[in-house]
Amino acid sequence: MSKIIAYDEEARRGLERGLNALADAVKVTLGPKGRNVVLEKKWGAPTITNDGVSIAKEIELEDPYEKIGAELVKEVAKKTDDVAGDGTTTATVLAQALVREGLRNVAAGANPLGLKRGIEKAVEKVTETLLKSAKEVETKEQIAATAAISAGDTQIGELIAEAMDKVGNEGVITVEESNTFGLQLELTEGMRFDKGYISGYFVTDAERQEAVLEDPYILLVSSKVSTVKDLLPLLEKVIQAGKPLLIIAEDVEGEALSTLVVNKIRGTFKSVAVKAPGFGDRRKAMLQDIAILTGGQVVSEEVGLSLETADVALLGTARKVVVTKDETTIVEGAGDSDAIAGRVAQIRAEIENSDSDYDREKLQERLAKLAGGVAVIKAGAATEVELKERKHRIEDAVRNAKAAVEEGIVAGGGVALLQSAPSLDELNLTGDEATGANIVRVALSAPLKQIAFNGGLEPGVVAEKVTNLPAGHGLNAATGEYEDLLKAGVADPVKVTRSALQNAASIAALFLTTEAVVADKPEKAAAPAGDPTGGMGGMDF
């Protein structure tokens, strides 16, 4: 395919147009008075959302240079969402402000590499200031307030705080759709481990990139599964039972994996293959934990069991299994409660007898997985569109609350970023590096200004006023009052604020140092073929 190339200012401006198109659509959602965006879907009802990363994913631009610019900003939103579960809109607004100021200086003759170094040093300083000023989240009320801001709903915030209180800060919280209205919290036996599906072809929900199995059989194998003839007798029995199958093994490869994938694609048989968690003896122990939790047995040569002779009686079961690319969650395993309690007691005894800090830490992890359980938040709504949007908000709020517990919280509403700007005075920079730091200083006010604008206030006036307020005091956009934001419950996890700034600066530096863009040449649509038979004389076709 032939390519087109743009250089210098033309290249950078093309990328900036794409960034602006995406950022302008996303930034209207920022803050408590932010608006919604409607996303058209090829199939089904449109989605209404105020989640930055969901909006960014949907934007596809026609111009090849603009398309690349938009894709780079999508990466900012996605990366921030992956790390912290929130802050995608803030990251996009910061990226837009950094690029706008940066390109203005590049056009005026500044050295892009000098600006890049200045931006990096300034971001490092602001990050350090944010982490120093962060307050630890200790109470249930603080967790509820942080989650409520992310979800835009106090009821959701309180429910998440309750869930974290019950399963612990590292515990598993999943969100499911409910047939009833409102929200419910259920605690179930369950486990999550950090291994995902071996092949993307196992995905059952393409939009969320998840494989969901309802009431599956669970096969646990301590060795590799590579030949299909070993697996076939058992597969036939599972297919006859009409249930899906989760395979957890050291690895699933070769023709065994191909057979599972082909049958999944054809719709003959639903299965998911996952690598077993851990290594060596720890892997064996974790497989045994899963076996006890699900009421199954580990197929292993050590205990005289092989795949060829394995029967359905050796398989575990669970109410539901959800597998993503990175992790597997087993909900309500069918294991015997006495056996689970016995296993928990055994692990506790091992923890007490262990001399190694590392071993003790790993045993604690196993104990938390086995005894902690899974909190399931069931969300209901009047329509499918509302239900999807609500479920997404709750999932983001859960990640947000966990981020708050991890690194602490700072004043929300863009105030922490703006009030960390004076720390840049401590940097002794000169020339283009000083200009780069100044670009960051200007950009730090962008989120607050956008929140004020979305709330119908004058951005410049609000930013000026907040600059002169004591640390942590600022605009509560929900009420229009200037107050101590942490006391008022307007807080952001510092992990969210920090990630948003770091990711935005990373992409802005790439924009400024770009000297050429190579893009695919847009193909002209082929002219429709004429009628080979020709028309009838005198007739108008």
UniProtKB/Swiss-Prot annotation:
Pfam families for the chain: Cpn60_TCP1
Q: Which PROSITE patterns match?
A: CHAPERONINS_CPN60
**Binding residues annotated for ATP, in chain numbering:** 29-32, 86-90, 413, 476-478, 492
Enzyme class (EC, first level): isomerase
**Gene Ontology molecular functions:** ATP binding; ATP-dependent protein folding chaperone; isomerase activity; unfolded protein binding
Q: Which GO terms describe its cellular component?
A: capsule; cell surface; cytoplasm; extracellular region
Q: Where in the cell is it found?
A: Secreted, Capsule; Cell surface; Secreted, Cell wall
Query: What keywords are assigned to this protein?
Result: ATP-binding, Cell wall, Chaperone, Isomerase, Nucleotide-binding, Secreted
Q: Give GO terms for biological process.
A: protein refolding
Which CDD domains would you find in this protein's record? GroEL
Q: Where the protein is mainly located, per its record?
A: secreted
Q: Which reaction does it catalyse?
A: ATP + H2O + a folded polypeptide = ADP + phosphate + an unfolded polypeptide
Q: Which domain of life is it from?
A: Bacteria
Give the matching SUPFAM superfamilies: GroEL apical domain-like (SSF52029), GroEL equatorial domain-like (SSF48592), GroEL-intermediate domain like (SSF54849)
Q: Does the keyword Transcription regulation apply?
A: no
Q: What is its EC number?
A: 5.6.1.7
Its assembly, as annotated, is: Forms a cylinder of 14 subunits composed of two heptameric rings stacked back-to-back. Interacts with the co-chaperonin GroES.
Give the protein family.
Answer: Belongs to the chaperonin (HSP60) family.
Q: What does this protein do?
A: Together with its co-chaperonin GroES, plays an essential role in assisting protein folding. The GroEL-GroES system forms a nano-cage that allows encapsulation of the non-native substrate proteins and provides a physical environment optimized to promote and accelerate protein folding.
Identify the PANTHER family for this entry: 60 KDA HEAT SHOCK PROTEIN, MITOCHONDRIAL
- For this entry, the protein name equals Chaperonin GroEL 2
Q: Please name the source species.
A: Mycolicibacterium vanbaalenii (strain DSM 7251 / JCM 13017 / BCRC 16820 / KCTC 9966 / NRRL B-24157 / PYR-1) (Mycobacterium vanbaalenii)
